[in-house]
Amino acid sequence: MHFDTSRPFFRPRRAQRVALAAMSVGALAFVSACSTASSDEAADSDTLNIVASTSIWGDVAQAVADSTDGVDIEVTSLVEGNNMDPHHFEPSAADMARAHEADVVVVGGGGYDAWLYSALDDQDKIIHSLPLTTHDHDHGDEHDDEAHGHEAHEHVAHAHDHGEEGHSHEVESIDGNEHIWYDPTAVMEVAHEIAEHINDVAPAANASDEEVVNQVSGLDSRLHELGKKNYVQSEPIADYLLAHTEMEDLTPEGYRHASLSHGEPAAADLAALIDELKSGNVDVLIYNPQTQTDMTTRIRTTAEDEGIDVVEIGETPPDHQNFFEYFDEVVSSLEALDA
């Protein structure tokens, strides 16, 4: 059985303004004095400009922006769609100019989108979930913010209550895994930080993270109800997603470490994973189509030959699909395993 979570779902989104009313020039004059004239239109003094590394964080920011009253907000995402691996994205000069001039920059951190935040002079305007480390592919060491000399918007190990169900856990880095947006708590914390920043700038805006919390806490509750299954991953895309479920990851450690480091697993590590798939102990393969190689194709073929269910979980949603809708599809695909 194959659960495809990559089908398109069209709706208008990102790079649009939440234009409820214009603020005074002084209230939102956050554009740097060194901004170039060519980008003045994109950074109007009465507009709060938010730049996100990917559409995931752009959708989180947009959901908060949609809750505001009396403030003009523009959200721009630099990476959209699922036709590329965001690990290797190279921003254009225009992308970086927009980020430098933005009032707020939203990233995941942990090295994943270091191509954006490592080049910014003003690190204090960055909202992030994992520490702002460089992407040196060394995931064996503990991450920290020392390279940047500050503790801007740190969310790691910040507890969040998930409501009546009592599902409360902390945002913690799992083996240096960068896919933090699949941690419901991390998403809610970033939304909270965005709302706080908007309200600091424009108190009358009444920005709220309520919509994000409502959507994501519901998904989190559904994840907690997943049944016991054994799985392996073509790449550790679902670590945060499944961390608080009864599902067990049987991916061999050598293969896992190599894929976390964005390296090629050794032949012995690949053989160990293939053997695991053939052992009869694996119920599902979690497959990341955006990091597909000849090796991962072989892994998928083996799983399908063994009658193992395949659930696709990508780095980013397809173009024109909202992250929350994509997240819902991913959870639905996992729930279908229990049907």
Residue spans for each PLM region:
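Extracytoplasmic metal-acquisition and chelation regions
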Residues: H2-S24, F30-A339
